Structure formats: structure tokens, C-alpha cells
Amino acid sequence: MAASKVKQDMPPPGGYGPIDYKRNLPRRGLSGYSMLAIGIGTLIYGHWSIMKWNRERRRLQIEDFEARIALLPLLQAETDRRTLQMLRENLEEEAIIMKDVPDWKVGESVFHTTRWVPPLIGELYGLRTTEEALHASHGFMWYM
């Protein structure tokens, strides 16, 4: 068996040309320093705008508090007037209910004191409907 001669591929005469192996990426976008400067500038502007808004919000909050403080005596007087009206209506109802009970004193204080004690919700709304009592104790938070 005759061995066949293998022909090996060889470089062209004079060799191959030089191979360019460096990365040749095009420049894209801003440099790192300019992006850092833009980021810091954005942070400073955001901080400044938040401080400005917080000052405005604080000024509006102070204005609201001053308005509430100015209206507080009026609202307290309205609440006191409503409470006294309800107590008077309760005393009239108590007089009607307890008229046949001997030795019953209408409006006698259960606290045995001469000082003013704000009435409890149950005392004010004891003779009222359940809806009124629920509205007074829970406001608009109940859904029944």
C-alpha cells in the first residue's frame, strides 16, 4: 500500500499581513466626568426644589394652624351650646320618665361635686336613638 502524500496548507509567499487585534470602539455619549457633573447638578437642583417646597408647605401649615386657633373658641362655644341643649332636653325627658318615683331629684349629679364635669357620651345620648349615639361616638366611620 502506497502512502499518499498529504499536502499541507502553507501561508502565502511572503506571509500573512499584520493582524489588528486592538479594540476599536467608537466614542459614544458623554464622558464619565460630564455625567458625574450632570448627576451632581441634578441632585443639587432636586434638593433645592424640595427645600423650597418644604418651606412653602410649612408656611401653609402655619397658616392653617393659625386659622384653627382663631376658630377654636367659636367651635368650642358651639359644642358647649349643643351639649347644654342636649343636657336640658335629657333633664326634661328624665322629669317625664321619673315623675312617679318618690324622692327622685331631677338632674342630681352622680359625681357628688359642684365642679363641672363634661358629660360622657352615654350620658348625653342615653335617651337618643342608636343612630345618633353611633354618629356621635364614631362619626362617619361606621357602615351599618
Swiss-Prot record:
Alphabetical UniProt keywords: Acetylation, Electron transport, Membrane, Mitochondrion, Mitochondrion inner membrane, Nucleus, Respiratory chain, Transmembrane, Transmembrane helix, Transport
Any single Pfam family the record assigns to this protein: GRIM-19
GO cellular component: cytoplasm; mitochondrial inner membrane; mitochondrial membrane; mitochondrion; nucleoplasm; respiratory chain complex; respiratory chain complex I
Transmembrane spans: 30-51
Topological category with respect to the lipid bilayer: Single-pass membrane protein
InterPro entries, alphabetized: GRIM-19
Subcellular location: Mitochondrion inner membrane; Nucleus
Location, primary (coarse class): mitochondrion
Modified residues (N-acetylalanine): 2
GO biological process: cellular response to interferon-beta; cellular response to retinoic acid; extrinsic apoptotic signaling pathway; mitochondrial respiratory chain complex I assembly; negative regulation of DNA-templated transcription; positive regulation of execution phase of apoptosis; positive regulation of protein catabolic process; protein insertion into mitochondrial inner membrane
Function text: Accessory subunit of the mitochondrial membrane respiratory chain NADH dehydrogenase (Complex I), that is believed not to be involved in catalysis. Complex I functions in the transfer of electrons from NADH to the respiratory chain. The immediate electron acceptor for the enzyme is believed to be ubiquinone. Involved in the interferon/all-trans-retinoic acid (IFN/RA) induced cell death. This apoptotic activity is inhibited by interaction with viral IRF1. Prevents the transactivation of STAT3 target genes.
Subunit structure and binding partners: Complex I is composed of 45 different subunits. Interacts with CARD15, but not with CARD4. Interacts with STAT3, but not with STAT1, STAT2 and STAT5A. Interacts with OLFM4.
Family classification: Belongs to the complex I NDUFA13 subunit family.
Entry-linked PANTHER family: NADH DEHYDROGENASE [UBIQUINONE] 1 ALPHA SUBCOMPLEX SUBUNIT 13, NADH DEHYDROGENASE UBIQUINONE 1 ALPHA SUBCOMPLEX SUBUNIT 13
Name of the molecule in the record: NADH dehydrogenase [ubiquinone] 1 alpha subcomplex subunit 13
Lineage: Eukaryota, Metazoa, Chordata, Craniata, Vertebrata
Name of the encoding gene: NDUFA13
